[in-house]
């Protein structure tokens, strides 16, 4: 049985029970402390990441906190993988979605954890102002009313960038005016709208901000992964360090293709078990929505079996 670890993105801390799920795990505590130490040493930032997680959702996702929220999620994810590795074999593949690419790459051995933490915070501070442009929302429909070609043509005409996570769940990044049009369209089509983050991730509109940081980011040391990485951006295996770094940046400004990536792993690479690393259950739900015969497991269940 071939297995893939799957790492969710920035929505990992939206719900209180997700935030609290792994906080008592020793490996998670260690990674949070390690991240705090790296930020203090390299950036002079004194942080209390554990304390931050225990505040409310609005505080955690405040735009000036968003880089630390990302650090917390990545620390939790890497800590969970640390624990799983003490009890189970390595997976055959590592798969990240958006921010999940950080923990994916660290866990694959291609990126040092402390370098990842510091680089992300430095990069995020250099794209200050992107929250003034637009936002990122989830758009869900039902099995009975799937998205149509006309819908996708309408999205394109509105200038929004659509990531197809599954056939009935989209991630939409756009300017504020276009997002308002999507919300109005949703009322007519019976779609459900979920706010995700307050800047237009996975869209063309933040390319100038990303390009301004590209040269410095491309100097970050990256290694050949020890566990294969599969990209939800290009839907292929990533091997070369330069390609891994380039995709980190491209994922921010281009659409991602979760269902296509999972389908390719299953059909072409024989993956029959996908393990959601968490801390949230969003990818667990999306995986179960894909009409293929594979096993979906949550890391929480595996951790429970090790106690």
Protein language model annotation of sequence segments:
Residues 10-12, 234-235, 280:
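Short glycine-rich anion-binding loops that position phosphate/pyrophosphate groups of nucleotides
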Residues 97-106:
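Glycine-rich nucleophile elbow surrounding the catalytic serine of serine-hydrolase chemistry
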Residues 14-16, 73-90, 94, 250-307:
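Flexible, low-complexity segments
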Residues 2-95:
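Helix-rich "cap/lid" substructures immediately adjacent to catalytic or cofactor-binding pockets
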Residues 9, 35, 77, 100, ...:
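Conserved small-residue
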Residues 19-26, 82, 109-119, 289-294:
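A glycine- and small-aliphatic-rich helix-loop capping segment at beta-alpha/alpha-beta transitions
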Residues 41, 107-246:
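Alpha/beta catalytic cores of group-transfer enzymes, especially the acyltransferase/condensing modules
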Residues 52, 95-96, 161-166:
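Short beta-strand
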């Amino acid at each position: 049985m071939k297995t893939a670890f799957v790492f969710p993105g920035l929505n990992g801390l939206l719900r209180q029970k997700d935030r609290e799920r792994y906080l008592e795990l020793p490996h998670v505590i260690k990674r949070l402390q390690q991240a705090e130490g790296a930020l203090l040493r390299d950036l002079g930032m004194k942080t209390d990441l554990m304390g931050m997680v225990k505040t409310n959702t609005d505080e955690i996702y405040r735009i000036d906190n968003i880089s630390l929220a990302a650090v917390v999620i990545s620390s939790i994810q890497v800590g969970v993988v640390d624990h799983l590795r003490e009890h189970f074999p390595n997976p055959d593949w590592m798969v990240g979605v958006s921010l999940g690419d950080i923990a994916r790459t660290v866990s694959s051995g291609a990126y040092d954890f402390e370098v990842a933490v510091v680089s992300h915070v430095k990069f995020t501070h250099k794209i200050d102002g992107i929250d003034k442009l637009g936002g990122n929302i989830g758009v869900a429909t039902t099995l009975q009313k799937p998205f149509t070609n006309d819908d996708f043509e309408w999205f394109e005409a509105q200038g929004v960038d659509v990531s197809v996570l599954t056939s009935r769940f989209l991630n939409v990044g756009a300017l504020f005016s276009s997002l308002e049009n999507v919300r109005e369209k949703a009322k007519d089509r019976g779609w459900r709208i979920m706010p995700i983050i307050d800047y237009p991730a996975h869209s063309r509109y933040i390319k100038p901000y990303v390009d301004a940081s590209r040269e410095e980011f491309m100097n970050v040391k990256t290694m050949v992964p020890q566990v294969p990485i599969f990209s939800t951006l290009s839907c292929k295996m990533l091997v070369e360090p330069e390609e891994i770094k380039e995709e980190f940046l491209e994922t921010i400004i281009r659409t991602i293709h979760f269902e296509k990536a999972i389908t390719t792993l299953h059909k072409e690479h024989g993956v029959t078990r996908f393990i959601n690393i968490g801390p949230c259950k969003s990818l667990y739900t999306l995986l179960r929505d894909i009409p293929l015969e594979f096993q979906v497991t949550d890391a929480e269940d595996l951790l429970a079996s090790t106690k």
